């Protein structure tokens, strides 16, 4: 099996397991409905899994959410160890994913410049319907 393919499959499976574990986590401060693990990146030796978290909320809420998840990383690692056949379960490290925030800023800048990709797409679709 291609090592890159195996790594991608493991990352995907770990991401699914983390979402399951999140639903079982009992922390009243955590708003589970708004937390998404956008991607998982395994190190080459598969001992570390960097998990990028996207969360709708204020910057303070996002920072607090990442801190809560990092405090519970033992729970997540145990859950992965029980549900995934690996020699060693990877150590989990949570980071805030700033990709969504950056894409919103880019969209706002485009709108300020007079170009709105969403409206242009709608116009093109309407023109196709008229033809």
From Swiss-Prot:
InterPro entries linked: KH_dom-like_a/b, RbfA, RbfA_dom_sf, Ribosome-bd_factorA_CS
Subcellular localization(s) per the UniProt record: Cytoplasm
Gene name of the record: rbfA
Quaternary context: Monomer. Binds 30S ribosomal subunits, but not 50S ribosomal subunits or 70S ribosomes.
Official protein name in the record: Ribosome-binding factor A
BP GO annotations: maturation of SSU-rRNA
Primary localization class, coarse: cytoplasm
Residues in coiled coil: none
Stated family: Belongs to the RbfA family.
């Amino acid at each position: 099996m291609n090592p890159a393919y195996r790594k991608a499959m493991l990352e995907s499976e770990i991401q699914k397991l983390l979402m399951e574990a999140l639903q079982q986590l009992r922390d009243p401060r955590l708003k589970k409905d708004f937390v998404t693990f956008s991607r998982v990146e395994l190190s080459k030796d598969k001992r570390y899994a960097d998990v990028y978290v996207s969360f709708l909320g204020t910057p303070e809420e996002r920072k607090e959410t990442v801190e809560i998840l990092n405090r519970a990383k033992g729970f997540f690692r145990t859950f992965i160890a029980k549900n995934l056949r690996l020699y060693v379960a990877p150590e989990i490290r949570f980071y805030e994913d700033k990709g969504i925030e950056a894409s919103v800023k880019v969209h706002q800048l485009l709108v300020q410049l007079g170009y709105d990709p969403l409206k242009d797409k709608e116009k093109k679709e309407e023109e196709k319907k008229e033809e």
